[in-house]
Amino acid sequence: MAFDYKKEYKEFYMPKGTPSIVTVPKMNYIAVRGSGNPNDADGEYKQAIGLLYGIAFTIKMSKKEDHQIDGYFDYVVPPLEGFWWQEGVSGIDYARKEDFKWISVIRLPDFVSREDFDWAIRKATEKKNQDFSKVEFFSYDEGLCVQCMHIGAYDDEPATVYAMHRFMEEQGYTLDITDQRMHHEIYLSDVRKVAPEKLKTVIRHPIKRA
């Protein structure tokens, strides 16, 4: 059985539909930075997703290549995630999607070193004849957060965010969104195959003691 991060780390990928407090450890990611409306058909975001999965599957299938990754075990590629912000806005203004700045990411297994990552960039570039220069090795220590499973359309997220913030305050915490700590989403559903009202998205916000 391939190792599935969603199932092995349910506290990070499968929270309940009610808010909870969690401390997220440092993780490494495949990452692409960009800006603009994620719904644009030919926008940066759609291109970024293609780049991310190109590297993610190159690493996953490295077991069939000459480059052998030390400590490799078979695994399910983790879900797509995104860190989002807007200049001059505290939190997210869903009515201004064209102003989004984002870092789109896919988690890397801990056994993937920076050298393995660099190999994957070279391999994918050669095999797919495509430019992967925007893809980076990204380490992030998220720390203390409030999170909740949001079920429904992305535009309906504000209601879940409101419940998260109310719970956070009741527990003695305050929001800690900064230039380094951002609105975070983990996408558990394939938007191409799942109806908007059934989409599952983990929403996570950084917090600190009030």
Annotate the PLM regions.
Residues 1-210:
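A solvent-exposed interaction/effector surface
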